[in-house]
Amino acid sequence: MPRYKLTVEYDGTPYVGWQRQENGHAVQNAIELAFKKFCGEDLTLSAAGRTDAGVHATAQVVHVDLTKDWGAGKVRDAVNAHLVMADERVSILNVERTTDTFDARFSARARHYLYRIHNRRAPLAVDYQRAWWVQKRLDAEAMHEAAKRLLGEHDFTTFRATQCQAKSPVKTLDRLDVIRNGDYVEMRVSARSFLHNQVRSFAGSLMEVGVGRWTADDLQAALEAKDRKACGQVAPPYGLYLIGVDYAFPY
């Protein structure tokens, strides 16, 4: 069966997350239904990142096996047409044929996320549900310096959800940068894989540094505590974006 690699963009606001669930409409549901209307097949998609409810993506990666050998452009345009007709907030940006051994999840070498904080006194209008609104002025430089304490391999128990199903809390963090961009404070983070709620836990804890309630040493102590109770608040999902996934090429 021909395998296809899809790059997908979506607004996570109306969805219960990426993964198909019984309690609501998921991004996976939306795309699988569009494929069903296109080719008449009941398909199961596999994604690089199983984003939570409200989390957005500009470059989610998915693979799917089809019975017929369709042209990549035909797949993209036909599935997008059905997504538009269904009023879904999902777009297939690119489709390419790939090898049978490519797996969107398990072949990934790195995942890249962006967390956006809208940092001004006035509330959000255009970017409502697209960024976390924090009124108090944040010291982005202090946040960036503190974030260096989290780089490398650590036991990130403090920064993972209590219901996280990962076998080990140990992960290697390759990048964690914080910069100010006008009224926004942006956190960019990269690793091969992440724990459940890890990025949002970083954002909430670094916000504590930004407003002056925590120092870099406090963040270090939270990391070393290996205790979920030591974490700062978990930032809301709507500020988080999956912005890229890296693979070895050729697949």
UniProtKB/Swiss-Prot annotation:
It comes from the Bacteria. GO terms for biological process: tRNA pseudouridine synthesis. Belongs to the tRNA pseudouridine synthase TruA family. Substrate binds at residue 113. Homodimer. This is tRNA pseudouridine synthase A. The active site is at residue 52. Pfam families: PseudoU_synth_1 (PF01416). The keyword Isomerase applies.
